[in-house]
From Swiss-Prot:
Top-level lineage group: Bacteria
UniProt keyword list: NADP, Oxidoreductase, Porphyrin biosynthesis
HAMAP family, A to Z: Glu_tRNA_reductase (MF_00087)
Pathway the protein acts in: Porphyrin-containing compound metabolism; protoporphyrin-IX biosynthesis; 5-aminolevulinate from L-glutamyl-tRNA(Glu): step 1/2
Gene Ontology MF terms in the entry: glutamyl-tRNA reductase activity; NADP binding
Active-site residues (renumbered): 50
Comment on protein domains: Possesses an unusual extended V-shaped dimeric structure with each monomer consisting of three distinct domains arranged along a curved 'spinal' alpha-helix. The N-terminal catalytic domain specifically recognizes the glutamate moiety of the substrate. The second domain is the NADPH-binding domain, and the third C-terminal domain is responsible for dimerization.
Native organism taxonomy: Bacteria, Bacillati, Bacillota, Bacilli, Lactobacillales
GN (gene name): hemA
Function summary: Catalyzes the NADPH-dependent reduction of glutamyl-tRNA(Glu) to glutamate 1-semialdehyde (GSA).
Species annotation: Streptococcus sanguinis (strain SK36)
Protein name, entry field: Glutamyl-tRNA reductase
One Pfam family linked to the record: GlutR_N
């Protein structure tokens, strides 16, 4: 069995192709089942988001798997194979798994380290399991990837380093340790930055959130809580006078915010260029230059963390390789267990003949304890077998164990390779 990745991503593929090559939620289940019917494809999981459409496959032959998966995508999306081939990326074996691990932690995302893709990957895995298109290999690969990604997020906290001016400003405010329950904030301007600030502000327990925009209806769209209010441009002075914290996300040709308009001790974040707030020395003012410097530092930290995570991915590849190698020992372990259970069943039959008056409860208790003895006796040998299966002389060691147990078999039998 071979691990194969077939994908289109934002890195290599133009938006015009990505828009066509996208599985909707409704199509996903049908596509999984149809893909599994294709020649050579034994297992499959489909990940389809706005930035990528990826097939994670287990195939019995790489060449055949590549051919049929490629044609499946071309037929499904009605894109000529020749055109699709310009952008399709194929990865095999370790490189397929490496890509999966990188995707899981966000190293292949537009925003390095973002965690949204982890939820999308988990959902893709669950959908494939429901469709019955996964098996032992993809189950292990995806469980390992999801566990790895969670551990990396917990260890490195890469998402604690924002990549937007809006979130950087909010986190700068967080560091001041203010009692938000007594603070009123104002967001001036509801363009992209202003909306982002509003989103993060509403996640915090501010006493009130005042939204001011030239088009009041845009502010009214955020009136989801009693503490949120919408204001027009003519209310600027009134809003500023009442705010403890001001986020100005509006582009103006001249200053519209002056110290005299603000409450004493007010904090101002001027988030756009040209600046909208007069740079008075009497103000506690954070401007785009201050925050951009902080943002660049965060971006550099994300890249540095990405490099450290990439090194840990190499360790995950070794773990998966060890697991794959141990697959060969599973049939032998099962045969040893089966042989022991056959002996137990034979002993039980003999016991019942010699002591026919045993009650059903007594028979069950004796059988239970006999199986317990078998499990205790086999526990350590099985652990040692798993260790031997990844050793330098694994073929010889396992053949010897099989011979000792009277199981004359060759390694590789029933492995599915």
């Amino acid at each position: 069995m071979h691990l194969l990745y077939v994908g289109l991503t934002h890195r290599e593929t133009p938006l015009t192709i990505l828009e066509k090559a996208h599985f909707s939620d409704q199509e996903g289940l049908k596509a999984l089942k149809l893909l599994k019917r294709e020649k050579s494809i034994l297992e499959n999981i489909i990940l389809s988001t706005c930035n990528r459409t990826e097939l994670y496959l287990v195939v019995d032959q790489l060449h055949t798997g590549r051919y049929y998966s490629k044609h499946f995508l071309a037929d499904w999306f009605q894109i000529p194979v020749k055109e699709l081939e310009e952008y399709l990326v194929f990865r095999e074996g370790d490189e397929a798994l490496r890509h999966l691990l990188r995707v899981s932690i966000g190293l292949e995302s537009k925003i390095v380290g973002e965690s949204q893709v982890l939820g999308q990957l988990k959902q893709a895995f669950l959908t494939a399991q429901d469709a019955g298109t996964t098996g032992i290999v993809l189950n292990q690969a995806f469980k390992q990837a999801l566990t790895f990604a969670k551990r990396m997020h917990d260890t490195y906290r890469i998402n604690d380093r924002p990549i937007s001016i809006g979130l950087t400003a909010i986190q700068e405010l967080d560091r001041m340790g203010l009692d938000y329950s007594t603070k009123k904030i104002a967001v001036i301007g509801l363009g992209e930055i202003g909306q982002l600030v509003t989103k993060y502000a509403l996640q915090r327990p501010f006493e009130s959130v005042m939204l001011l925009n030239r088009t009041v209806s845009k502010a009214q769209a955020f009136l989801t809580e009693d503490r949120v209010s919408a204001h027009g441009w003519d209310e600027l002075e009134e809003v500023l006078a009442d705010a403890d914290v001001v986020f100005s996300a509006v582009k103006t040709e001249e200053y519209i915010i002056f110290p005299s308009m603000l409450k004493e001790g007010a904090i101002v974040f001027d988030l756009c260029l040209p600046r909208s707030c007069h740079p008075s020395s009497s103000l506690k003012l954070y401007n785009i230059e201050n925050l951009t410097n902080q943002l660049e530092q965060y971006k550099a930290e994300r890249q540095e963390i990405a490099g450290r995570i990439a090194l840990e991915i190499d360790e995950e590849l070794v773990k998966f390789a060890d697991w794959r190698q141990q697959l060969g020992i599973i049939p032998l372990i099962q045969e040893i267990r089966d042989k022991a259970l056959e002996a137990q069943a034979s002993a039980m039959e003999s016991l019942n003949r010699k002591i026919p008056d045993l009650t059903e409860r007594e028979q069950k208790q004796i059988s239970k304890h006999m199986k317990s003895i078998i499990n205790q006796v086999l526990k350590e040998p099985i652990l040692q077998l798993k260790e031997l299966s990844v050793g330098e002389h694994s073929d010889y060691d396992i053949a010897l164990i099989a011979k000792i147990f009277g199981l004359h078999r060759e390694r590789g039998k029933d492995e599915g390779h």
